[in-house]
């Protein structure tokens, strides 16, 4: 047992069984589904594009369940990596690992179980999909440690959150075409942009604690940088249409998504914590709008 676990042990021992289950639920962010939705939409974009419509139902189930499992596992390993930092950050000081309600060892077991269940589901698909899941595990497990070494953890998050895209094409088509990699690139740009909103919420705390983020890197040019990222995302999504020939419905979806992004800049233009967090949450609707465009175009 680590020194941290010993120090936090009394907080964990005083909990009833329902309370402990509630702490585990918070640990996997079951009470905050936004992260799963931000991971789900690009995965569904890929499934619908790869299948040219509704994908096989079992494949759809595996990827939908896998989104929740891997996102939950990612949250657990993130909190484990930040268990020394989170007690000193306003937004994260009440997390189960930060308060000691869940020990570091327990968190690692939760991570392992979630990843094993996710891998068991992937194992029912073809071998290319199984092989692609291996770098997916590495991306999910290593992301939390990037903020100590680079100002670009948001880019890495986009790589991790979007890895379901090449896996989806592999599962449906047996290969990953250029279209799949274009969609993956668009997702990296999107995730970097929306997670910068999130990083702006914590910017003052991160500077004080020595953590790194794109919000710190961009500084006073943060809104300009995000505008460029979103513009590049839409440019790459336009290239997706050149490959897939999706038509008017897809462009209507992109148009709605662009209006939603413009609204984010309006509400967060003064960079306050609350509006920046709302702008981050608002990206759920951006992902949904793009998905609806793809789904209608594929009918």
Swiss-Prot record:
Subcellular locations according to the entry? Cell inner membrane
- Bilayer-spanning residue ranges: 34-54, 57-77, 108-128, 163-183, 221-241, 245-265, 277-297
One GO term of the biological process aspect: ubiquinone biosynthetic process
UniProt keyword Electron transport, yes or no: no
Q: Which GO terms describe its molecular function?
A: 4-hydroxybenzoate polyprenyltransferase activity
Pathways per UniProt: Cofactor biosynthesis; ubiquinone biosynthesis
Q: Which GO terms describe its cellular component?
A: plasma membrane
Q: Per the UniProt record, which EC number(s) apply here?
A: 2.5.1.39
Tree of life domain: Bacteria
List UniProt keywords, sorted A-Z: Cell inner membrane, Cell membrane, Magnesium, Membrane, Transferase, Transmembrane, Transmembrane helix, Ubiquinone biosynthesis
The protein's predominant localisation is membrane
Q: Which residue windows are coiled coil?
A: none
Note the InterPro entries from the entry: HB_polyprenyltransferase-like (IPR006370), Prenyltransferase (IPR039653), UbiA_prenyltransferase (IPR000537), UbiA_prenylTrfase_CS (IPR030470), UbiA_sf (IPR044878)
- What PANTHER family does its record include? 4-HYDROXYBENZOATE POLYPRENYLTRANSFERASE, MITOCHONDRIAL (PTHR11048:SF28), PRENYLTRANSFERASES (PTHR11048)
Annotated function: Catalyzes the prenylation of para-hydroxybenzoate (PHB) with an all-trans polyprenyl group. Mediates the second step in the final reaction sequence of ubiquinone-8 (UQ-8) biosynthesis, which is the condensation of the polyisoprenoid side chain with PHB, generating the first membrane-bound Q intermediate 3-octaprenyl-4-hydroxybenzoate.
Q: Which NCBIfam families match?
A: ubiA_proteo
Task: Give the family, as the similarity comment puts it.
Answer: Belongs to the UbiA prenyltransferase family.
User: Mind telling me what this protein is named?
Assistant: 4-hydroxybenzoate octaprenyltransferase
């Amino acid at each position: 047992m680590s020194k941290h676990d010993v120090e936090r042990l009394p907080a964990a021992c005083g909990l009833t069984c329902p309370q402990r289950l509630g702490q585990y639920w918070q640990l996997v962010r079951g009470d905050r589904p936004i992260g799963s939705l931000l991971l789900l939409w690009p995965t569904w974009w890929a499934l619908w594009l790869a299948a040219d419509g509704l994908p096989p139902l079992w494949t759809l189930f595996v990827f939908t369940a896998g989104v929740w499992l891997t996102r939950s596992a990612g949250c657990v390993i993130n909190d484990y990596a930040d268990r020394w930092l989170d007690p000193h950050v306003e937004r994260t000081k009440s997390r189960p690992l930060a308060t000691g309600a869940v020990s570091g060892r327990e968190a690692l077991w939760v991570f392992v179980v979630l990843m094993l269940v996710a891998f068991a589901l992937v194992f029912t698909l073809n071998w290319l999909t199984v092989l692609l899941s291996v770098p997916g595990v590495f991306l999910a497990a290593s992301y939390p440690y990037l903020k100590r070494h680079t100002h670009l953890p948001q880019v890495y998050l986009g790589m991790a959150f979007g890895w379901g895209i090449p896996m989806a094409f592999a599962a449906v088509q047996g290969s990953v075409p250029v279209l799949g990699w274009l969609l993956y690139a668009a997702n990296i740009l999107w995730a970097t942009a929306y997670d910068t909103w999130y990083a702006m919420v914590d910017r003052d705390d991160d500077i004080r604690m020595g953590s790194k983020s794109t919000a710190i890197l961009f500084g006073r040019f943060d809104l300009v940088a995000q505008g460029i990222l979103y513009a590049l995302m839409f440019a790459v999504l336009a290239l997706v249409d050149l490959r897939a020939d999706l038509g008017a419905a897809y462009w209507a979806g992109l148009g709605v998504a662009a209006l939603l992004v413009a609204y984010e800049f309006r509400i967060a233009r003064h960079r306050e914590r609350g509006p920046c967090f709302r702008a981050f949450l608002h990206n759920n609707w951006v992902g949904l709008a793009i998905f609806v465009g793809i789904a209608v175009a594929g009918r």
